């Protein structure tokens, strides 16, 4: 009986190892959404720069952190201030989406568009919370431009009454470690 049990255990272990080995040879399929999400993960760390005007705009700090076992990238804008905002980037049903927790008290959601490239992620409004209609003021679109590994520009389009009324721009550089 012990021999049969040991043989069965060894056979089960061998079968499991064979399955793992077979899968290990497969390359995970990559999608534009997954590639873009991986690019966001590379932003991890502290970034400093300007909001508004590249030279004279107000100082801005942004912290990027990968969280939730690698399934979410958290962007904290103006950390520790009364105007602190958080944007969470994550994959949902194979699409890269974001939820922006705005100082205005609403939470617009956006999805990566087909216009996105490896150097520029383009997001557009798909809904949100505390926004009763598209006429309510909210962030409606966002673009992140990667300039090498240590520079980033982002633009956030604000919509009011169904049309774009402002674009918030950020010019950031990675804090040296």
Language model regions located:
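Positively charged n-region of N-terminal signal peptides that target proteins for export
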Residues: 1-6
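Bacterial N-terminal signal peptides
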Residues: 8-18
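Hydrophobic small-molecule pocket/channel-lining residues, especially in calycin-type beta-barrels
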Residues: 25-177
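Sec/Tat signal peptide C-region and signal peptidase I cleavage site
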Residues: 20-23
């Amino acid at each position: 009986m012990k021999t049969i049990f040991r043989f069965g255990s060894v056979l089960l272990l061998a079968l499991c190892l064979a399955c793992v080995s077979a899968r290990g040879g497969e390359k995970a399929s990559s999608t534009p959404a997954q590639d873009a999400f991986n690019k966001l993960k590379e932003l991890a760390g502290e970034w400093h720069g300007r909001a508004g005007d590249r030279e004279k705009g107000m100082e801005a700090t942004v912290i990027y952190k990968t969280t939730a076992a690698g399934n979410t990238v958290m962007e904290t804008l103006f950390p520790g201030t009364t105007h602190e905002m958080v944007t969470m980037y994550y994959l949902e049903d194979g699409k890269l989406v974001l939820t922006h927790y705005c100082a205005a008290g609403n939470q617009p959601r956006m999805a990566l568009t087909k216009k996105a490239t490896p150097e520029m992620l383009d997001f557009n409004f798909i809904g949100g919370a505390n926004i009763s209609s598209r006429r309510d003021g909210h962030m409606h679109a966002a673009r992140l431009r990667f300039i090498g590994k240590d520079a980033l520009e982002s633009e956030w389009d604000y919509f009011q009454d169904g049309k774009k009324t402002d674009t918030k721009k950020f010019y950031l550089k990675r804090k040296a470690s």
